[in-house]
């Protein structure tokens, strides 16, 4: 008698080309896989973690007692004679990371402390600098002396400008030389006035007080010269 069927044959394991068959097979096999894993945990008191990605990219997981607990145990708490080196390597790496974090934080703290001390010192110097006017020049420190010199220079500049302004108001043709580096003297109203000195330098005014200009006008007395 001839057999009507081909009998039991071994199915070739290849990827399915038909999309609908692939999705149906995945759903059935996934459920069967998780069921077998659950039975294995019950029979052998084993701890299992499974993560499955579907063809569409969805994630499915199974774990006993919990997937997260088992993953943490695998990453950081590996024990056993065969995994001693792995555990030591992980511990060393963890210590190195902690040391690096500690060094960075310590550097930031030291930097902030230095900035704080610098700001406090500047505030103290500013407070002391404001008291220079009530002390003798011999009693001033560096910061107070610097403040005094700066204020006096500003005051001298204001006085010079005010004096020149008043002179120009009384005699528009009068010119006072500046402390510029110009080599040639300025010619004003027929006379030469040196520009190598400031208006209030130690040598006094930039021209002889009794000098009579060509136009016969006495500078100091503002009267016609002899």
Swiss-Prot record:
Keywords: Coiled coil, DNA-binding, Nucleus, Transcription, Transcription regulation. Residues 6-66 form the MADS-box domain. One of its GO terms (molecular function) is DNA-binding transcription factor activity. The keyword Secreted does not apply. Residues 95-132 form a coiled coil. Residues 108-127 have a biased composition (Basic and acidic residues). InterPro entries: TF_MADSbox, TF_MADSbox_sf. This is Agamous-like MADS-box protein AGL23. It is found in: Nucleus. Disruption phenotype: Embryonic lethality when homozygous. Probable transcription factor that controls female gametophyte (megagametogenesis) development and chloroplast biogenesis during embryo development. One of its GO terms (cellular component) is nucleus. The lineage of its organism: Eukaryota, Viridiplantae, Streptophyta, Embryophyta, Tracheophyta. It holds the Pfam family SRF-TF. Residues 108-131 are annotated as: Disordered. SUPFAM superfamilies: SRF-like. It comes from the Eukaryota. GO terms for biological process: chloroplast organization; embryo sac development.
């Amino acid at each position: 008698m001839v057999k009507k069927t081909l009998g039991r044959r071994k199915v070739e394991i290849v990827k399915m080309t038909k999309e609908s068959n692939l999705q149906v097979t995945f759903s059935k096999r996934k459920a069967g896989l998780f069921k077998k894993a659950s039975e294995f945990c019950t029979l052998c008191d084993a701890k299992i973690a499974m993560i499955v990605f579907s063809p569409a990219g969805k994630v499915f997981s199974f774990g006993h007692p919990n997937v997260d607990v088992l993953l943490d145990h695998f990453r950081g708490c590996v024990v056993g004679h065969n995994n001693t080196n792995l555990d030591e390597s992980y511990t060393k790496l963890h210590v190195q990371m902690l040391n690096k974090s500690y060094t960075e934080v310590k550097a930031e703290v030291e930097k902030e402390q230095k900035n704080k001390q610098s700001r406090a010192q500047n505030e103290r110097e500013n407070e002391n600098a404001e008291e220079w006017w009530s002390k003798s020049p011999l009693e001033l420190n560096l910061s107070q002396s610097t403040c005094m010199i700066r204020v006096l220079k500003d005051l001298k500049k204001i006085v010079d400008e005010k004096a020149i302004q008043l002179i120009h108001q009384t005699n528009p043709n009068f010119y006072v030389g500046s402390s510029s580096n110009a080599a040639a003297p300025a010619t004003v109203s027929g006379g030469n006035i040196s520009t190598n000195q400031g208006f209030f330098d130690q040598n006094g005014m930039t021209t002889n007080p009794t000098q009579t200009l060509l136009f016969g006008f006495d500078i100091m007395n503002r009267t016609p010269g002899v």
